[in-house]
Amino acid sequence: MTQRIAVLGATGSIGDSTLSILAAHPEHYQVYALSGHGRLDKLFELCQQFRPSRVAVPENKVDDFATRLAAAQIACEVVGGQAGLDDIALDPQVDTVVAAIVGAAGLASTLSAAKAGKRVLLANKEALVMAGSLMMQAVRDNGATLLPLDSEHNAIFQCLPPQIQQNNTAIHDASHGVKKLWLTASGGPFLNKTWEQMQAASVSEAVKHPNWSMGQKISVDSATMMNKGLELIEACHLFDLAESQINVVIHPQSIIHSLVEYCDGSFLAQMGSPDMRTPIAHALAYPNRISAGVESLDLYQLSSLEFIKPDLKKFACLKLAREAMQSGQAASITLNAANEVAVEAFIKQQVSLTDIALINAQVLDKMLGKDKSVAGHAAISVRQITELNDILMIDKIAREQAQLEVMACRN
């Protein structure tokens, strides 16, 4: 039976990798819908190649894009904005939603897909970082299937007992014997650099990842290890564990993608070449397997596998993420929002790479009431989050505060 796939965030790196696999297996998959935001020329080319039934673009681009498709004789419904993304996520013709929109912009459509009981292939970290409780509740209440695309979470999923994978049973049930999860991190381009070298780093240096080909924002997050911090928060929600049960270890070779430690002393690890097509192919085909077009590891050529404890002074963002998870959902929302603003400012060369952690810390302190100079925000730390609007309110305030911190760094 052919799966009808909606790829939300089709023009990004995850979208690229996903569509390459879908193109290689037309007998299994039909590209039913696509979405794009800034790279509409590329989205048009994808529409030419895959001939989707529906496509989502920014609200102010709907008419122009529809005219362009019609001129090319491509029969495709064009929908716009957040409402369009949600409508595709809810479309009864869609079997699987690939949630690959970067940042908070992908939150609402991912939540909509879960509420519609879809099979959701999750690459959007914010769905769990910002709305972990709401997202997992929506999955449970509506019979949705949630499969992680992050290489680390996908690796952990593969190393868990089948009854946890297939029945969504509690990972902390003693009978399963799971003791800890280990998230691996490459250490990024500054693993062997000093803090001072990080402070002076250019944007081009920060986005030059040693092992992975990724988008600009996630590459900067990898350089500061905020990416791993967000993945830690994500893993807590995805696998229903406390942050104390999840360790982070730097593994520069990026061959082991994560590990599960069991109570009998066993460690199960998932290994493979550092290529996002592997976890994407796994999630698309689960519980079966398909070719991902990835070259196999040559075990004879692996001279060593290193494991290093992270330096939390140099990679302060990782420490902030763990503290945010301890403080509750509002802190995670705040940290994610502040980080998006700070990373954008770094990419625009308005702040330094090391300013990102400083901005994040200051926004957390002020939003959660630790810094009394910002009146009225202390209640956010204990605010009950029951709906998407609560999340968006905290996100908005945190972004405004982060913009003030960026301005302070520039002065």
UniProtKB/Swiss-Prot annotation:
Listed cofactors: Mg(2+); Mn(2+)
| GO biological process terms, semicolon-separated | isopentenyl diphosphate biosynthetic process, methylerythritol 4-phosphate pathway involved in terpenoid biosynthetic process
Is the keyword Manganese assigned to this protein?
Answer: yes
Q: Name the residues that bind NADPH.
A: T11, G12, S13, I14, N124, E126, G215
Family matches, as InterPro entries: DXP_reductoisomerase, DXP_reductoisomerase_C, DXP_reductoisomerase_N, DXPR_C, DXPR_C_sf, NAD(P)-bd_dom_sf
Catalytic activity of the protein: 2-C-methyl-D-erythritol 4-phosphate + NADP(+) = 1-deoxy-D-xylulose 5-phosphate + NADPH + H(+)
Q: Where does 1-deoxy-D-xylulose 5-phosphate bind?
A: K125, S151, E152, S186, H209, S222, N227, K228, E231
Stated EC number for the protein is 1.1.1.267
Q: In which pathway does it act?
A: Isoprenoid biosynthesis; isopentenyl diphosphate biosynthesis via DXP pathway; isopentenyl diphosphate from 1-deoxy-D-xylulose 5-phosphate: step 1/6
Any idea which UniProt keywords this protein has? Isoprene biosynthesis, Manganese, Metal-binding, NADP, Oxidoreductase
What general EC class does the enzyme of this chain belong to? oxidoreductase
Q: Could you say which residues bind Mn(2+) here? A: D150, E152, E231
Q: Does the keyword Zinc apply?
A: no
Under Gene Ontology molecular function, one entry of this record is: 1-deoxy-D-xylulose-5-phosphate reductoisomerase activity
Q: Which family does it belong to?
A: Belongs to the DXR family.
What does this chain do?
Catalyzes the NADPH-dependent rearrangement and reduction of 1-deoxy-D-xylulose-5-phosphate (DXP) to 2-C-methyl-D-erythritol 4-phosphate (MEP).
Its protein name is: 1-deoxy-D-xylulose 5-phosphate reductoisomerase
Q: Which organism is it from?
A: Psychrobacter sp. (strain PRwf-1)
